[in-house]
Design a protein with these regions (language model features):
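Short hinge/gating elements
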Residues: 7-11, 65, 122, 201-205, ...
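Canonical P-loop GTPase G-domain recognition
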Residues: 196, 202-259
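Alpha-helical scaffold elements adjacent to nucleotide-binding pockets in ATP/GTP-utilizing enzyme cores
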Residues: 101, 138, 163, 167, ...
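Flexible active-site lid/hinge loop adjacent to a nucleotide/diphosphate
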Residues: 179-209
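Nucleotide-state-sensitive switch-loop elements of NTP-binding domains
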Residues: 5-65, 71-160, 167-174, 179-182
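Well-ordered beta-strand positions
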Residues: 149, 170, 195-196, 234
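Conserved phosphate/pyrophosphate-binding and hydrolysis machinery centered on Walker-type P-loop NTPases
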Residues: 15-16, 29, 33-37, 64, ...
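Long, well-ordered amphipathic alpha-helical subdomains in the mid-to-C-terminal portions
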Residues: 22-24, 237, 248-325
Length: 327
């Protein structure tokens, strides 16, 4: 039998910045076991007194943009400035495969051994909401352990960008120089949540020229989208592989934070906490449905009936909820 978690001792060790304790605490908040969930709530309650001034940045990008290379370059630049950097991931594929993304550390070999950086693969969970819950709570653990910059990478496709945008201060979108329409290939809605945009792989020569042209075209298009007086996402060029102009991207991230202002940042985080409250409710209901004896008793039969077309989805849903309510 697994011994109960000594939450108070774990809190002290996290605040003392012990890496093993940070890993243990994140494992605890990722767990779906009811006893672990209770311990995780106690842990997070005790850690809430930690300073909330860490810079939270979400990072996404088009396929093949070199996201991991860029994150490693940015993270290395930041630790060189004296920051402590935490890197987390939200990966919808872990919902389907049931496993975590183990490639994050292997793709960021230099940053993974940096004593002032902490990289955590995306957790496995039954739902994207579960992954988001674990990631948001892992972020709080890292901040309590003194990590003052948190980079959250979105992996794969789907709603992960919107999910991450709901837990960070600034959302950075990476794109590539393209022939023709620079907006082509950027998913609908992504520009609504992007605060800073960088055209990556702007290495020397033709690549840099193409990237600068793309950035200019994209910036022009954005000015037509955003109204006067609002924050218009700046479009920069950078090269994650060499680190070129990564510092300029970071400067724009800080400028966006200044644009929000202290009260604006507090209001944004408060709204995010309220949204996160309801996300936790939905995730907990998912967990309870999965554990429900009544639901388990009828699930297989309903599954067969729905697949066979003998029962429609709304009726099946009503039966599942009735079984859950009867527990």
């Amino acid at each position: 039998m697994t011994p109960p978690v000594d939450v108070s001792a774990l809190v002290e060790r996290v605040r003392a910045r012990e890496r093993a304790a940070v890993s243990r605490a994140i494992t605890l908040v990722e767990s779906s076991r009811p006893d672990h969930r209770a311990s995780a709530r106690e842990l997070l309650s005790e850690l809430t007194g930690a300073p909330a001034d860490a810079v939270r940045v979400g990072i996404s990008g088009v396929p093949g943009v070199g996201k991991s290379t860029f994150i490693e370059s940015l993270g290395t630049y930041l630790t060189g400035l004296g920051h402590r950097v935490g890197v987390l991931a939200v990966d919808p594929s872990s919902v389907r495969t049931g496993g975590s993304v183990l490639g994050d550390k292997t793709r960021m070999q230099s940053l993974s051994v940096d004593p002032n950086a902490f990289i955590r693969p995306s957790p496995s969970a039954g739902t994207l909401g579960g992954v988001a819950r674990a990631t948001a709570q892992a972020m709080l653990v890292l901040e309590a352990a003194g990590y003052d910059v948190i980079l959250i990478e979105t992996v794969g496709v789907g709603q992960s960008e919107v999910t991450v945008a709901g837990m960070v201060d600034t959302f950075l979108f990476l794109t590539l120089a393209r022939t023709g329409d620079q907006l082509q290939g950027i998913k609908k809605g992504i520009l609504e949540i992007a605060d800073v945009i960088a055209v990556n792989k702007a290495d020397d020569g033709d690549q840099e020229v193409a990237a600068k042209v793309a950035a200019k075209e994209l910036a022009g298009a954005l000015r037509l989208v955003y109204g006067a007086g609002s924050w218009v996402p700046p479009v920069l060029t950078a090269a994650g592989l060499t680190g070129k102009d990564v510092d300029a991207v970071w400067e724009r991230i800080l400028r966006h934070r200044e644009h929000l202002g202290e009260q604006g940042l507090l209001d944004k985080r408060a709204a995010q906490q309220w949204d996160f409250t309801w996300a936790l409710v939905r995730d907990e209901l998912d967990q309870r449905l999965a554990r429900s004896p009544g639901v388990r008793a009828i699930r297989a039969e309903l599954h067969r009936d729905v697949l066979a077309g003998d029962i429609v989805a709304p009726t099946a849903a009503d039966e599942i909820l009735a079984a859950f309510d009867a527990d």
